[in-house]
Amino acid sequence: MRGLRSVIAVVGAAVCAGALAAPAWALAPSHANITFAAGSTVTETATGVTASAVLVWRQGASDVHGVGCCASDVVDAITGATLVEATPQSSFSFQWASDDARSFRVDSFDARGNYVGSAFTNAPTFVSNVGAPPDADATYAGAWSTQTTASALGGSLHFSTKKGASATFAGNVRTLAWITTVGPTHGSAQIFVDGHQVATVSTHAATVGFRRVKFARAWWGGPNDPVHTIRIVNAGTSGHSRVDVDGFLAVTED
């Protein structure tokens, strides 16, 4: 069974043929991305993994005509089916399997139905390609151990109980997410993104839960994904200092 650094191809930037030209201030092709739902559980299957994904997009200054803002249609770009019509939201949740090709188009309109732009994602599949240990592409510093358990992705995970122990994952990505374990002996971790601390995340819970997405970060950008880094640092929580690394999800451009 393969384990888990999941790599996901996503986010194209081609303009929809035949669409009306969008004003520069409106929703643009690069204004869509896919991230992962914090607190959700990643499921391992016979062919890979399934994760709770979220398509997100920017509405832009879509009410320049002063008629009211805004609504969006979410379209399956492969089948042409409209998945959500005239939603005032700027996100759409779905289950994403590693062998499932996904491609979306988001069309936005003002309150009178005037088209104000489209955004696109192109995600042929995401591929789980990590063997044991399931987070082999991460770099570890400090005291870490490996636990073998059928509940972990790929059958094993890394854990540390020492303050300052860290795990770093880097790549040319559009989105990064950390998968861990929660439980009564688990504590907090400091999250650094591209060298800057952005959050302190608790993995403490009354009962044990495996394969949890506890942090995700997505970036907006053009066609070339830069190198981004996520570093998980054990905060050394008194009385329950364990921090696990079961893997990472990384969205990359097609």
Which sequence ranges carry the predicted segments?
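Secretory targeting and sorting signals
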Residues: 2-26
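Glycan-recognition surfaces in beta-rich domains, encompassing non-catalytic CBMs
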Residues: 26-75, 79-254
